[in-house]
Curated annotation (Swiss-Prot):
Gene Ontology terms describing biological process: cell division; chromosome segregation; DNA recombination; DNA transposition; resolution of DNA recombination intermediates
Function: Site-specific tyrosine recombinase, which acts by catalyzing the cutting and rejoining of the recombining DNA molecules. The XerC-XerD complex is essential to convert dimers of the bacterial chromosome into monomers to permit their segregation at cell division. It also contributes to the segregational stability of plasmids.
Organism of this sequence: Vibrio cholerae serotype O1 (strain ATCC 39315 / El Tor Inaba N16961)
Location relative to the cell: Cytoplasm
Additional notes on this entry: During infection by the bacteriophage CTX-phi, it is required by the bacteriophage, which uses host XerC and XerD proteins to integrate the bacterial genome.
The protein's name in its UniProt record: Tyrosine recombinase XerD
Claim: Membrane is one of the keywords in the record: no
Domain Core-binding (CB) per the UniProt entry, residue ranges: 6-91
Domain of life the protein comes from: Bacteria
GO molecular function, one term: DNA binding
Similarity comment text for this entry: Belongs to the 'phage' integrase family. XerD subfamily.
Length: 302
């Protein structure tokens, strides 16, 4: 028999359910919130606080405690984001008359530029899979689609047949916060997807049926982690330093290379599914740094 939840744990679970069902937060985000908020509840229990009466000063105490635990600034910022959302919810649901988290100050974060690949490196990465193998033909189509669309890895591995129109050349994506967007695929990606659908997909599915466009070797939905391992495998073949990579390396390359060729920032924002333009603007810094590097390497007076 499972252990009964405390009142505070019950409130957190109600909050997480709301984030999941009504706000459309991704499973990974909800799991992260649950983990972060469990730390808060544990600290509160040890210090005789409850969610319905902890004050701003109490939350500041918790913030100080987090600093003493040597968490990275990014981790502390993420934890404070979860706390703010929780207390906004409790205030909205009238569990509390106030929101004690409203004045909490987040740690200052260094600007982190996305890891950048040159066009030549992207070409090498896209050429690494052997399309004679059904598995690598799938990977080739996935890599081409990632670079052509800038999808998030979670959006790619969960892409279904009904959300892709090869005739119209677009994919329909349900992004963060349940926001839907249409993204054009480009001829190259379409050709490789068609080849995979005709020659490789049925071999991976075997006797199983699935609406997932890119099934795993067992005919099921691939995990993000599995695809990340595949990217690293091809990076080694392409002679790319794995340290330069992240799971979203082709999403970053998509955005940076579009901007390098003069794409409008707001168009790139729309294609990436960013709700805030400032999130997209970071790619302009990458593009600028790349231009400076090229200038330094090739200009006679640099």
């Amino acid at each position: 028999m499972s252990e009964a939840l405390s009142p505070d744990q019950g409130l957190v679970e109600q909050f997480l359910d709301t984030m999941w069902f009504e706000r459309g937060l991704a499973e990974n985000t909800v799991a992260s919130y649950r983990n972060d908020l469990s730390k808060l509840l544990e600290w509160m229990a040890q210090n005789q606080y409850r969610l319905d009466f902890i004050s701003f000063a109490g939350l500041q105490e918790y913030q100080s405690w987090l600093s003493e635990q040597n968490y990275k600034p990014t981790s502390k910022a993420r934890m404070l984001s979860a706390i703010r959302r929780l207390f906004q919810y409790l205030h909205r649901e009238k569990v509390r008359a106030d929101d004690p988290s409203a004045l909490l100050v987040s740690p200052k974060l260094p600007t982190r530029l996305p890891k950048d690949l040159s066009e030549a490196q992207v070409e090498a990465l896209l050429s690494a899979p052997d399309p004679q193998s059904p598995l690598e033909l799938r990977d080739k189509a996935m890599l081409e689609l990632l670079y052509a669309t800038g999808l998030r890895v979670t959006e790619l591995v969960s892409l279904t047949m009904e959300n892709m129109s090869l005739r119209q050349g677009v994919v329909r994506v349900m992004g963060k916060g349940g926001k839907e967007r249409l993204v054009p695929m480009g001829e190259n990606a379409i050709e490789w997807i068609e080849t995979f659908l005709q020659q490789g997909r049925s071999l991976l599915l075997g006797e199983q049926t699935s609406d997932i466009v890119f099934p795993s070797s067992r005919g099921q939905q691939m995990t993000r982690q599995t695809f990340w391992h595949r990217i690293k495998h091809y990076a080694v073949i392409a002679g790319i330093d794995v340290e330069k990579l992240s799971p979203h390396v082709l999403r970053h390359a998509f955005a940076t290379h579009l901007l390098n060729y003069g794409a409008d920032l707001r168009v790139v924002q729309m294609l990436l599914g960013h709700s805030d333009l400032s999130t997209t603007q970071i790619y302009t810094h990458v593009a600028t740094e790349r231009l400076k590097q090229l200038h330094n390497e090739h200009h006679p007076r640099a």
